[in-house]
């Protein structure tokens, strides 16, 4: 990651933390930008600038980081509300539709985003695209005994799906739910994310896919202007 990209991520993470208020239950996302947000939240709590905050994490890594920083946590099943969820994205299109799941935790991320009263997406400017899936693969979480069948069905839908392999262990990536991940590319990208999310999730053996449709309320973008990192709230198109 370049120094400029790090500056963009830091700026947008700080802007998101600034929207957290005392007494909130906050969904804590996953990924590099979300990690900076969690660190910023922990620092504000430690300094007494925020209080009575409860976090709901979306990944094991986020849970460990938040606990190390002293952020009180609550399980999703024990939560009757989430006031605000903050998470990153791998791609964002002009209509605020997203691809997430580069870290293979999109199931929990989607559950938290869906529960939240307000969902803020934090990205740097490199994550903005005109069409989803032209560059970033679409993750699909599948039952271990169904990945070949799902791979075949995705092919019939025009997608090329490959089993995601681990880099620090032999064999495939295994999700927090004990499932596998197929990474899918559609040749011309995804023209109708809403329909495709539904169609993929209707395939037997699929738990969830990484299309987040009609969930984001605001997209904060970190960008560099005149050599200085800043943040803007993206205007939704369509």
Curated annotation (Swiss-Prot):
Documented EC number(s): 5.3.1.6
Reaction(s) catalysed by this chain's protein: aldehydo-D-ribose 5-phosphate = D-ribulose 5-phosphate
Alphabetic keyword roster: Isomerase
This protein's encoding gene: rpiA
Entry GO MF terms: ribose-5-phosphate isomerase activity
GO BP annotation list: D-ribose metabolic process; pentose-phosphate shunt, non-oxidative branch
HAMAP family: Rib_5P_isom_A
InterPro entries the UniProt entry points to: NagB/RpiA_transferase-like, Ribose5P_isomerase_typA_subgr, Ribose5P_isomerase_type_A
Residues at the active site: 109
UniProt name for this protein: Ribose-5-phosphate isomerase A
GO cellular component terms, semicolon-separated: cytosol
Family to which this protein belongs: Belongs to the ribose 5-phosphate isomerase family.
Function field: Catalyzes the reversible conversion of ribose-5-phosphate to ribulose 5-phosphate.
CDD domains to which the protein is assigned, alphabetical: RPI_A
Pfam families linked: Rib_5-P_isom_A
Disulfide linkage: none
Subunit structure: Homodimer.
Binding positions for substrate per the UniProt entry: 30-33, 87-90, 100-103, 127
Domain of life: Bacteria
Record keyword Heme present: no
EC primary class: isomerase
Pathway where this protein functions: Carbohydrate degradation; pentose phosphate pathway; D-ribose 5-phosphate from D-ribulose 5-phosphate (non-oxidative stage): step 1/1
């Amino acid at each position: 990651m370049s120094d400029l990209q790090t500056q963009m991520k830091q700026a947008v993470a700080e802007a998101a933390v600034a929207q957290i208020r005392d007494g909130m239950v906050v969904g804590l996302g996953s990924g590099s930008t979300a990690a900076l947000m969690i660190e910023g939240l922990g620092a504000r709590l430690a300094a007494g600038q925020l209080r009575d905050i409860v976090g709901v994490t979306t990944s094991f890594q986020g849970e460990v980081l938040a606990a190390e920083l002293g952020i009180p946590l609550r399980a999703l099943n024990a939560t009757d509300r989430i006031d605000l969820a903050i998470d990153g994205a791998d791609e964002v299109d002009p209509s605020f539709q997203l691809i997430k799941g580069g870290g293979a935790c999109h199931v929990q991320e989607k559950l938290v985003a869906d529960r939240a009263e307000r969902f803020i997406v934090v990205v740097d400017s490199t994550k903005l695209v005109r069409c989803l899936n032209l560059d970033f693969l679409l993750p699909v979480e599948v039952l271990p005994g169904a990945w070949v069948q799902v791979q075949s069905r995705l092919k019939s839908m025009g997608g090329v799906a490959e089993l995601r392999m681990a880099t620090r262990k032999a064999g495939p990536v295994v999700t927090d739910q004990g499932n596998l991940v197929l990474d899918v590319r559609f040749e011309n990208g995804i023209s109708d994310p809403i329909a495709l999310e539904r169609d993929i999730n209707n395939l037997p053996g699929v738990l969830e896919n990484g299309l987040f449709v009609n969930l984001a309320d605001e997209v904060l973008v970190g960008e560099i202007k005149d050599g200085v990192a800043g943040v803007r709230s993206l205007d939704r198109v369509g």
